[in-house]
C-alpha cells in the first residue's frame, strides 16, 4: 500500500516583492494581454490599499478585472502519493499597481526533520507559474453549433507563464498556479514550508 504525503503551503511562503537580482529561469517572450471587455463594469471600491493573496480551489477561474469574492486562506494543504503531481492555486489582486511580483516557495521540509537534507523535497519539485489571460467567447451552451456573433467576447484565465516575475496592474487579478511533483523516493509524512 502506498503512503501519502501532505504538504502545507503558507501564504507567507509566497512573496510579493520588487523584482531584483538574477534568476535561474530562462527568458521568455512577453506579450500584451488584450483589454478586458468586462473592465468597464468592475467595482473595486471594496478593495483595500494593500495587495492581497489567497489560496483558492483549482476548480475556479477568476476574471481579470473582477474583484475576487473569496474567503481569505493563508495556507493550503495538498495530499499526494509518491510520484504524483498535485496543484494549488493562489490568487493575487490589488487596487494599485505592483511592479515585479515574484512567487517563491521555500523548501519543503518533513515536520520531524529540522537540519539535514533528509526529509526535504528538492527545489525542482515545486513550480510556480503566473496564469495569463487570453481572449475567448463565452462558453454558454458548451460545444455546440453556434454563430460567433451570438456570443460575447471574454478574457479568460488560460495560459501558464514560466516568467519569474510579472507586474500586477491596478484593479486586476493574477492567479498563480503551483505544481508539486512528489519524488518517487519521498519519505511519507507531513511536509511544510517555513
What are these regions (language model features)?
Residues 1-4:
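Positively charged n-region of N-terminal signal peptides that target proteins for export
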Residues 6-17:
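Bacterial N-terminal signal peptides
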Residues 19-194:
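Mature N-terminal, pre-catalytic/accessory segment of carbohydrate-active enzymes
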